[in-house]
């Protein structure tokens, strides 16, 4: 078994990839919006874009997500967040998901999403060893 960590900080990594033989498990840390002036729909879109970019870096796609955890600063934003989620998620490949109301670390954050994906690399290239993974966002500089 081999473990790769990406965008390593003193407290956490943005993403961890575990090679489990013929496949990989991808653990994405909680992602938050960079542009905190956006409404819940905008912040959700931005966060899901960060997740897409991290998955893409290792050769995975959103349909490989097997589990997601959504944290909302206001449970009143549930319907609006779901509208964006429903447009983004791949039908027929919806992951197990939990959504909870939570006091987020920065009061300007409206949503935080973490995800776990599982996939088998198809192209023979191990993207997890690429060194050009750009940091998708600031993540509150709390790593």
Predicted regions located by residue number:
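N-terminal presequence-like segments and the immediate start of the first folded domain
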Residues: 1-66, 72-143
